[in-house]
Amino acid sequence: MNMKVENKIMPNEEQINGFLENSEIGPISMVNLLKFKEKACYEDKRDTDLTGEEAYRLYAVEVINFIEKYGGEFIFGGKVSRLMLGEVEDLWDAVAIAKYPNRKAMLDMTMDPEYQKIHVHRDAGLEGQLNIETI
């Protein structure tokens, strides 16, 4: 069996629409498989010496407050050390798991204007990710 794996920064329209359906389903846990850029690259072209991981870390330390503000909790975060089973062309750098009361809580968090301010560090640091919803 071959599985196509494609890291992305943002969900596509079909994924967004699916997430909006049954927004009260929950609790949900989001498993994030993260791949960082070698060097952070900000959309506003600011000069930086940060690695992608360092830029993402600026986002990560702040996003925990937003997860909690919307009734969720940060469950786990860690660096990937190796692949135990299976094969992928390029291994992810880190894994993070966050739990939300429901889809709506996560969506509300992402729409928060204060959250949007820290999102620039996420985008600057991430080469791509897989974000897997579990119920």
Predicted regions: what is each one?
Residues I97-I135:
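Short, Lys/Arg-rich amphipathic alpha-helical interaction segments
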